[in-house]
C-alpha cells in the first residue's frame, strides 16, 4: 500500500479546549455540548454528540472553542488516548488536542481508526512524570503514514461495518435494560406490593463470599483460568466481557463463579461511586472463572435475576455505595451491607417477575458476546489494514 508521510499539522488543524468557570452558573445549562475525557470513559461508539454538560453562548465565549462536525476528538491527558468523532458541533475541555480534518487529504473516519491503531506510538509524545500530556506543539509534529483518499475510504468502510454492528447491538441492549428496569419499577412500587411483601435485612436472605488476592506474576500469563475483576463491572451495573484477565494461581472452591451468579464491586478507583456497590450477573464464559478480592459473590436462595434487579433498579446499589470510604480509592466493607433493609415480595411475585426478565438477561448476554467477538475481529483487522499487510482495492 502506497502512503505519504505527513505531520498531523499537514492534514488538519490541531485545536485545544477549555473550561469556563464552573463557579459561574451563567455559563452553563444551554444547548452547546461540552465534553471532558470523563465523557469518553468506557465510551464504545465512534461518534459522539454530547456528554453530561452543556454550555450557553456566554459560556462558549468565556473559555473554549466550538469544533465543527467531523472533528476527531483526542484526549491528550488524564488519560492520553480516548478518541471519538464529533457528530455535530461540540466543545471540549483542555484535556483534548482535537483535529479539524482537511478533507481533501484525510478522511475523518480513517483518521479515527489510524489513531486507534497507533495509540502506543502516539503516547510516546506525552511528557510529564505523574500525568503525561501531549502538548499542541507535539501533536502537530507527529508523523503519520497516509494512503490515498480512495484507499482511506475503503479501509474506513471495512472497519466501520463492524462498528455499526456493535452499535446496533449496543442499542438493543440499552432497550432491553430499559424494559427490565421499567418492569421492575412498575411491579415493585411500594404501594403495589403492600401486603404482599416483607421488610427484611439483607443478611436474612444473602451471604457473601470474598474474592481472591493475586500477585502481578499470577496474571502475567497467556494461559489460565478467567479472573473476573473490577473491570468486569459496568458503571452502575452490568457485566463487561472485555475486562477479564487470565490467572494461574490458587483459589478456593467458593471463589468460583458460574453462569447466573451475582457479583458486586467493593472497590472504586475514583470518587464517582459508579462501580462500588454495583452488581453484575455472570454470563456463560465457557471457562472456569474465579473472582478477585475487589468483588464479592452474593449467595442466596432468592433467584439472582430478582436480586440483580433489586440492587440495580431498586437503587439498593446506590444506597450501598454511600457506605464506601477512602481518600483516593473507595473501599466497601462487605459485611457493612448486611444490615441494610430491603422490601422482599412474596415468592409468587418474584417467580412471575423472573419469568419475564430472565429471557431479557439471556438476550443481553448473547448480544454482549456478539459485541465481544465483533470487537476482536475488528481489532485484528485494524493493524493489518493500516500497515498494508491486508491489501484493499480502492
What are these regions (language model features)?
Residues 36-38, 51-116, 229, 253-316, ...:
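A short beta-sheet element
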Residues 5-25, 38-69, 87, 92, ...:
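Sequence-specific dsDNA recognition surfaces
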Residues 76, 90-98, 128-156, 287-294, ...:
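A short glycine-rich beta-alpha junction/loop motif
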Residues 21-29, 127-128, 198, 215-223, ...:
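Short coil/turn segments at secondary-structure boundaries
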Residues 115-119, 123, 163, 315:
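Short amphipathic alpha-helical signal-transduction/dimerization elements
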Residues 103, 119, 123-126, 166, ...:
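Structural signal for hydrophobic packing residues in well-ordered secondary-structure cores
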Residues 1-18, 141-213, 343, 347-389, ...:
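Non-catalytic DNA-recognition/assembly elements of restriction-modification systems
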Amino acid at each position: 500500500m502506497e502512503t505519504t508521510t505527513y505531520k498531523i499539522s499537514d492534514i488538519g488543524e490541531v485545536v485545544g479546549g477549555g473550561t469556563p468557570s464552573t463557579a459561574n452558573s451563567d455559563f452553563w445549562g444551554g444547548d452547546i455540548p461540552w465534553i471532558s475525557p470523563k465523557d469518553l470513559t468506557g465510551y464504545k461508539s465512534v461518534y459522539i454528540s454530547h456528554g453530561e454538560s452543556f454550555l450557553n453562548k456566554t459560556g462558549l465565549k468565556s473559555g473554549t472553542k466550538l469544533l465543527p462536525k467531523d472533528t476527531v476528538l483526542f484526549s491528550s491527558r488524564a488519560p492520553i488516548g480516548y478518541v471519538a468523532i464529533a457528530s455535530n458541533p461540540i466543545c471540549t475541555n483542555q484535556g483534548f488536542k482535537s483535529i479539524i480534518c482537511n478533507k481533501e487529504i484525510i478522511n475523518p473516519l480513517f483518521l479515527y481508526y489510524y489513531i486507534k491503531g497507533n495509540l502506543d506510538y502516539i503516547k510516546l509524545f506525552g511528557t510529564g512524570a505523574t500525568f503525561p500530556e501531549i502538548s499542541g506543539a507535539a501533536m502537530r509534529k507527529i508523523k503519520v503514514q497516509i494512503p490515498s483518499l480512495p484507499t482511506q475510504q475503503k479501509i474506513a468502510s471495512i472497519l466501520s461495518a463492524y462498528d455499526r454492528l456493535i452499535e446496533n447491538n449496543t442499542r438493543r441492549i440499552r432497550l432491553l435494560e430499559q424494559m427490565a428496569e421499567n418492569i421492575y419499577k412498575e411491579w415493585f412500587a411500594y404501594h403495589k406490593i403492600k401486603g404482599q411483601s416483607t421488610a427484611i435485612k439483607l443478611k436474612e436472605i444473602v451471604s457473601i463470599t470474598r474474592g481472591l488476592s493475586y500477585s502481578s506474576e499470577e496474571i502475567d500469563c497467556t494461559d489460565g483460568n478467567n479472573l473476573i475483576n473490577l473491570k468486569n463491572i459496568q458503571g452502575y451495573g452490568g457485566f463487561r466481557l472485555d475486562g477479564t484477565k487470565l490467572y494461574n494461581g490458587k483459589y478456593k472452591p467458593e471463589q468460583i463463579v458460574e453462569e447466573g451468579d451475582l457479583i458486586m464491586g467493593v472497590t472504586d478507583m475514583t470518587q464517582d461511586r459508579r462501580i462500588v456497590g454495583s452488581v453484575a450477573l455472570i454470563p456463560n464464559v465457557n471457562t472456569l472463572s474465579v473472582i478477585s478480592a475487589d468483588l464479592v459473590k452474593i449467595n442466596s436462595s432468592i433467584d439472582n435475576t430478582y436480586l440483580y434487579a433489586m440492587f440495580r433498579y431498586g437503587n439498593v446499589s446506590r444506597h450501598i455505595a454511600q457506605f464506601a470510604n477512602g481518600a483516593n480509592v473507595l473501599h466497601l466493607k462487605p459485611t457493612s451491607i448486611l444490615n441494610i433493609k430491603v422490601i422482599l415480595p412474596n415468592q409468587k411475585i418474584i417467580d412471575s417477575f423472573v419469568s419475564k426478565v430472565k429471557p431479557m438477561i439471556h438476550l443481553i448476554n448473547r448480544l454482549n458476546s456478539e459485541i465481544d467477538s465483533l470487537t476482536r475481529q475488528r481489532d485484528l483487522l485494524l493493524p493489518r489494514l493500516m500497515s498494508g499487510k491486508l491489501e484493499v482495492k480502492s
